[in-house]
């Protein structure tokens, strides 16, 4: 997968799971991330159609997929599935796909939702969407740092 670069256009982030996929999208300048929706997974064909619709409606130019790693940085049981999903997206949509370390995003998303006093029932889908926002915002912030030129003295 590719490293962050300076491509303009909206970026779609996915918090990939076996039952749900949380989605977030950037603004056109690639500065901020907003939660979009949570897709309930059914099968590859249905998932593909739903993602194609999101990509077309939002004029997506790049995709970021959360990479589930262990706290140590080692691969988890879900890491290979996420990599396979990212490769599938890259093949299906012919768009650049980046993998992004998603450690702590679900923990942080759950903390934020608990503090907002959202009911446990509503948290299920919201946590995936918020995790996608956190993945995308971290990606965008890193890209912004990489774009900055050194200060001249």
Curated annotation (Swiss-Prot):
For this UniProt record, the keywords arranged alphabetically read as follows: Cytoplasm, Hydrolase, Nuclease, Ribosome biogenesis
* CDD domains tied to this protein: YqgF
Alphabetical GO CC annotations of the entry are: cytosol
TM spans (from-to): none
Enzyme class per UniProt: hydrolase
EC number from the UniProt entry = 3.1.-.-
Query: Which example biological process does GO assign this protein?
Result: rRNA 5'-end processing
Family label: Belongs to the YqgF nuclease family.
What is the role of the protein in this entry?
Answer: Could be a nuclease involved in processing of the 5'-end of pre-16S rRNA.
Annotated protein name in UniProt = Putative pre-16S rRNA nuclease
């Amino acid at each position: 997968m590719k490293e962050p670069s300076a491509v303009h256009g909206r970026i779609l982030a996915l918090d990939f799971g076996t039952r749900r996929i949380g989605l977030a999208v950037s603004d056109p300048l690639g500065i901020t991330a907003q939660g979009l929706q949570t897709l309930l997974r059914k099968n590859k064909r249905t998932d593909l159609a739903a993602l194609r619709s999101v990509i077309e409606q939002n004029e997506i130019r790049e995709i970021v997929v959360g990479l589930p790693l262990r706290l140590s940085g080692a691969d988890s049981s879900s890491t290979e599935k996420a990599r396979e999903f990212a490769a599938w997206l890259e093949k299906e949509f012919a768009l650049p796909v980046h993998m992004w370390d998603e450690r702590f995003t679900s923990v942080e998303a759950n903390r934020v939702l608990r503090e907002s006093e959202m009911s446990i029932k509503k948290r299920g889908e919201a946590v995936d969407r918020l995790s996608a926002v956190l993945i995308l915002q971290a990606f965008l912030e890193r890209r912004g740092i990489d774009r900055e030129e050194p200060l001249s003295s």
